[in-house]
Design a protein with these regions (language model features):
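A short amphipathic helical element positioned immediately N-terminal to and/or at the very start
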Residues: 1-6, 108
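Transmembrane helix-loop-helix hairpins at lipid-water interfaces of multipass membrane proteins
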Residues: 5, 11-68, 72, 145-150, ...
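An intracellular "coupling" helix at the cytosolic face of ABC transporter transmembrane type-1 domains
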Residues: 6-9, 97-98, 114-123, 127, ...
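Hydrophobic alpha-helical membrane-associated segments
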Residues: 20-24, 56, 60-77, 158-172, ...
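Short intracellular "coupling" helices and adjacent cytoplasmic loop segments at the cytosolic face
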Residues: 42-43, 78, 86-110, 114-116, ...
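Helix-loop-helix
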Residues: 44-48, 139, 143-160, 164, ...
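ABC-type nucleotide-binding domain
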Residues: 322-574
Length: 574
């Protein structure tokens, strides 16, 4: 496992400490037997004191090794889990939207949290309880055989029977644990839908339906968990039964051999301790090994994320590196050149043969009916997807030749659903500019008509709940716009970012934006015609195709689709 390679030194030290612990544990029963057989029975006080000192040293080795081994193994497991979690998170940031959708949000949360916690516990328990078993079993049987060959052979047979039972149980448990993880994914998905969509569920009186759906998912998980518990109960019962049988067998065989003067009575105690020690560790190892199939499934799921190749690959060019494409618009910040796009699982193009440019100092608007592909244009500019045909250029360079970091560093984006992160207003604004001063933030808030923040007692330090749920929809949109303005980008994209604003605030905001973005290109994606009336050019989309391109007055005369949208809104009071 590549994540353990970074901790080779810690692994070696941990195993060495555990070895010291096990050696100390194994020495004590033999020393005790020798003390009784040789020292006490003969009254040799010097031997008793000397052997007692050796036992004290061995006990100190075992105790110190156990404490230090627990600490080191816990630290190792936590570090490895942290590295895996960071790697999964970093990989998720590299994935394109289509790559991310292969797993789903619920599954990615499970893989990043629950699965890696399972892996961490498996590493910890394997180091502490499984790895010592082979050494303890072999060494314990050898110690018992050195005391008495017949007793050592008996102990070896008992251990072999227990190991066979463990292998059989683990083989049956593996597929059940695999199913358990898929059920956890389903529970996460259904629970997340119910929590996020609780208002919709209540609005449609679907509480009973959702309760039944949740009950079905929970029941599937519970049924499989019960099967696992049955295996654990069976393993526990059989192991304790075998331990008791082994204890009786050792006492019976040992008693007969003592009666036959083939061994001394204290040796029975030593062999019995070895038997119980080995069988206890074997039993604990069985419990851990039963969970290893689940850990293996979790590791495989994390590996699936780490091994997926992102469909969006960074280019090596930088803006200003070499001449732009011939025939391109020299004034364009962003340009679509006969660009078509189709989703991987689609039969038809979502966008077909788009050609237009967003020029510096101008506002370009995109309008169209729902499903016409307006928001997809924004996602393509941000390179969440790559064009299927044609090209999209940023400052004359094809996006596919640029890195995603460089592209997004030049673009400020306000998404269709304004999302704010938990923290404060200031921390959200600094997403756009980490080095922003208080004056910068106040200016952005003023342009975005978000001065309501200053009316709050804490001002810029006003708390923001996850998703910005402690603000209204219009306030969230204005704060998201202020965050974008902090970036001082070459291209501003507003994806239906004025929909929750009243007409007065909308007009004031657009007027302030004209001055603030005079040196940049602006792309506004909108439903309301009133929002884009004064755009320098308006792109009209229908079913993914450009059916109109021009200013408002021109389109009212030449574009039937645009005229129909405008007239329908005017009749509706807009």
């Amino acid at each position: 496992m590549r994540f353990l390679k970074s901790y080779r030194g810690l692994v070696a030290v941990t195993l060495l400490v555990l070895l010291v612990d096990n050696v100390g544990t194994l020495l004590v029963p033999t020393m005790l037997a020798n003390m009784v057989n040789t020292g006490i029975t003969t009254g040799d006080v010097d031997y008793i004191l000397r052997n007692g000192l050796y036992m004290l040293i061995a006990t100190g080795m075992a105790s110190g090794g156990a404490v230090l081994g627990c600490y080191l193994s816990a630290r190792l497991a936590a570090n490895v889990a942290c590295d895996i979690r960071n790697a999964v998170y970093d990989k998720s940031l590299e994935l394109a939207a289509s790559d991310f959708e292969r797993f789903g949000t619920g599954s990615m949360i499970t893989r990043s949290l629950n699965d890696i916690n399972v892996i961490q516990q498996a590493i910890l328990q394997t180091i502490q309880l499984v790895l010592p078993v082979p050494f303890l079993a072999v060494a314990g049987i050898i110690f018992a055989w050195l005391i008495d060959p017949a007793m050592g052979t008996l102990l070896g047979v008992v251990v072999a029977i227990v190991l066979v039972a463990a292998v059989f149980t683990v083989a049956n448990a593996a597929p059940i644990f695999m199913r358990l993880q898929s059920f956890i994914d389903r529970m996460n998905v259904v629970l997340r839908e119910n929590i996020v969509g609780v208002r919709v569920i209540r609005a449609f009186n679907k509480e009973l339906h959702e309760e039944q759906r949740l009950d079905e998912v929970f029941s599937d998980y519970a049924d499989n968990a019960i099967k696992v518990n049955h295996l654990f109960v069976g393993l526990d019962s059989s192991t304790f039964f075998l331990m008791n049988i082994a204890e009786v067998a050792v006492l019976w065989v040992g008693g007969n051999r003592v009666g036959a003067h083939a061994m001394q009575i204290a040796s029975i105690s030593a062999v019995l301790e070895y038997a119980l020690l080995i069988l206890f560790f074997v039993m604990m190892a069985q419990m851990v090994v039963l969970t290893l199939p689940r850990a293996a499934a979790c590791l495989n799921r994390a590996q699936q994320v780490l091994e997926i190749e992102p469909s969006i690959v960074d280019g090596e060019r930088t803006l200003g590196d070499g001449a732009p494409a011939s025939g391109g618009d020299a004034d364009a910040v962003a340009e679509f050149d006969h660009m078509s796009f189709r989703f991987d699982d689609a039969d038809e193009d979502t966008l077909c043969d788009l050609s237009f440019a967003c020029r510096r100092g101008q506002t370009t608007a995109i309008v169209g009916s729902t499903g016409s592909g307006k928001s997809t244009v924004a996602k393509l500019l941000l390179r969440f997807h790559d064009a299927t045909k044609g090209a999209i250029r940023l400052d004359g360079v094809d996006l596919r030749e640029l890195s995603q970091d460089e592209i997004r560093g030049r673009i400020a984006y306000v998404p269709q659903k304004a999302w704010l992160f938990s923290g404060t207003v200031a921390s959200n604004l600094r997403f756009g500019n980490e080095d922003a001063t208080e004056a910068d933030m106040l200016h952005a808030l003023q342009v975005a008509q978000s001065t309501f923040v200053l009316d709050q007692p804490q001002g810029l330090d006003t708390p923001v709940a996850q998703g910005g749920t402690n603000f209204s929809g219009g306030q969230r949109q204005r704060l998201a716009i202020a965050r974008a303005l902090m970036k001082h980008a070459d291209l501003y994209i507003f994806d239906d970012s004025f929909s929750a604003l009243d007409f007065k605030t909308d007009a004031a905001l657009r007027h302030a934006l004209q001055e603030e973005t005079r040196d940049a290109a602006v792309l506004i994606i909108a439903q309301r015609i009133s929002t884009i009336l004064h755009a320098d050019q308006i792109v009209v989309l229908k079913d993914g195709e450009v059916v109109g391109l021009g200013a408002h007055d021109e389109l009212m005369e030449t574009c039937e689709v645009y005229r129909a949208i405008a007239e329908s809104q005017m009749k509706g009071g807009e």
